[in-house]
Amino acid sequence: MSSDLSLDRAVTHRFFDAQAAEILHNYGRGRAIVAVDGAVGATGFGRELVAALERAGHASVFASIDDFAQPTAPGEAARQTSSDYYERRYDYATFRRVLVDPFRLGGSAGFVVAAFDESASRAIEPVWRTAAADAILVVAGPFLARPELRGTFNYTIFLETPARPRSVALDEALDRYTADAGPRFVATAIVDTTDPDRPRRVFADSC
C-alpha cells in the first residue's frame, strides 16, 4: 500500500513539475496570473501547482475565487438558484480591485487573497501582502473563463472530470457556463482529473 502511495505521489509530482515548467517557460519573468478553472478539485490542483512552482524555485501565490463570494446573509447561499449562482455568486469587482490589479502592479503594491468567508457569512479583515517581482498568482475555482474575466489570466487550465458538485444550483450553473463561455475551447491547457492522483493532459485536437 505504501509503495503504491509513493508511486502515485511520484506520478503526481512529475505531472505538476512538467506543468510548472511549461508555465515558467512562457511566463518566468514578470508577474503572471494562472487560472485553474473547475468546480470540483480546483483548489487541490491549484495548491499542487503552487507547490511545483515553488519546487522550481519560483515565488507563487494561491487564491480561491470562493474567497471572493458576494456577501450574503446566513443561509442565503444555500438558497441560491442556478441563475443566482452563475450571475451573482462572486464579487468580481472586489476580486479585481484588491487582488488582480494590485498584483499586476508589482513592486511594493499590496494585494489581498481573500475577502469574504462564506461559511461564517462575514467579510474577512484584509491582510495585505506583497510578493516577488516575478511571482505567479494561481487562482482556482469555477467560471474563470467567463466573458467578464477574459484578459485577466495569462494561462488557463481547464479541469475535465466526470465528478459533479454537490450543489444542484452549481451543477446547473456549470451547464450554462459551458454553453455561454466554451471554457474548454479557450483554455491554454486541458487536464483530465478523473483520477485526481494521476492528472492527464488532454489535447483538444486529439479528442
Describe the residue ranges of each PLM region:
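Glycine-rich phosphate-binding P-loop
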Residues: 34-53
